[in-house]
Design a protein with these regions (language model features):
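A short helix-loop-helix "switch/interaction" segment in the helical subdomain of ASCE P-loop NTPases
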Residues: 235-249
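Conserved Walker B catalytic segment
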Residues: 119-186, 194-197
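Conserved NTP-binding/hydrolysis module of P-loop NTPases
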Residues: 67-73, 83-117
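Conserved catalytic segments around the Walker B and adjacent sensor/switch elements
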Residues: 46, 60-82
């Protein structure tokens, strides 16, 4: 009998699965970055990998880790106007503002900022750097910081990336309690890291997400199904594990459909576990 009526596997884009397997090293790198303070490698990170490999899931878990420590987090997905949206979310809660975004600006009395983004209250310009600094002033009084994550970074406009990279570079040089993590397809590296204007991003700690070792997949299947009152072992377990090829999305998809069919066919599954493996074979063929 199943111990839960909710399928524990989540084969949908970006959904955080109940158990995140095979990513301990990258998660530990991020935690150490938060622990070790400004300038720690894990606070400036770039994550690459194929579609479906779990980049969005990792960013979600990073935000969860930071929020459990009291940090404020801002999540963005790269598209036109990303820097403008980031600035809007950083604006003070009071006042009347006029927003503008320019790929290249020159503002008197404000330090040089490539790809400057600013909004105005009266005649006082506020750059993205200043907006982030103002938010950090508040957060650092409570000994917490700000995490910004950017997904699909390979699709970002150059002006947006220049504005964000420039602001973050200045703030890191000032030892502010800030972390930036950006993720994208492998093409992101050649697109942004070879841009002379954004050499700062080359110093981001690289984390390449690959397939999950099959041994870890097998263990995760055993534990996850067992928590639902299902015994998956022997040949059925081997076939299910092999079918995933260690690909994170396939782990969720295979697990989801096995759990779904088991829920509908309790007696048949009981026969499969003790007398054969054809049940899983037929399921995976479907």
């Amino acid at each position: 009998m199943l111990n839960t009526t909710t399928n524990p596997f989540k084969p949908s884009a970006g959904h955080l699965p109940p158990v995140l397997i095979g990513r301990d090293l990258v998660l530990d790198d991020f935690r150490e970055g938060l622990d070790n303070g400004s300038g720690a490698p894990g606070r400036l990170m770039r994550i690459t990998g194929a579609r479906g490999i779990g980049k969005t899931v990792i960013l979600t878990e990073f935000r969860n880790i930071a929020e459990r420590r009291g940090w404020q987090t801002i999540s963005e997905t790269a598209s036109a106007g990303m820097a403008q949206r980031l600035l809007s979310r950083l604006q003070p809660q009071k006042g009347s503002f006029s927003f503008s975004f320019e790929p290249s600006v020159s503002i008197s009395n404000v330090g040089g900022s490539l790809g400057g983004v600013h909004y105005e209250r009266a005649s006082i310009p506020l750059t993205l750097r200043e907006a982030m600094s103002a938010r950090l002033d508040t957060l650092e009084k409570r000994n917490v910081g700000l995490l910004v994550t950017i997904d699909e970074a390979q699709a970002a406009d150059r002006a947006d990336m220049v504005a964000i990279a420039t602001a973050v570079q200045h703030l890191i040089s000032e030892d502010r309690n800030l972390s930036l993590v950006f993720a994208g397809l492998p093409s992101m590296s050649s697109k942004w890291l070879n841009d002379n204007v954004m050499t700062f991003l080359r110093r981001a700690q690289p984390e390449r997400l690959g397939d999950i070792p099959l041994g870890e997949v097998s263990n995760a299947f055993v534990d996850t199904f067992h928590s639902s009152g299902i015994i998956l072992k022997g040949e059925p377990l081997r076939i299910a594990t092999q079918a995933t090829a260690g690909y994170p999305f396939m782990i969720q998809l295979v697990g989801y459909h096995i759990w779904r069919v088991v829920r509908r066919n309790h007696d048949l599954w009981r026969y499969c576990c003790f007398c054969g493996w054809w049940f899983v074979v037929e399921l995976l063929r479907q």
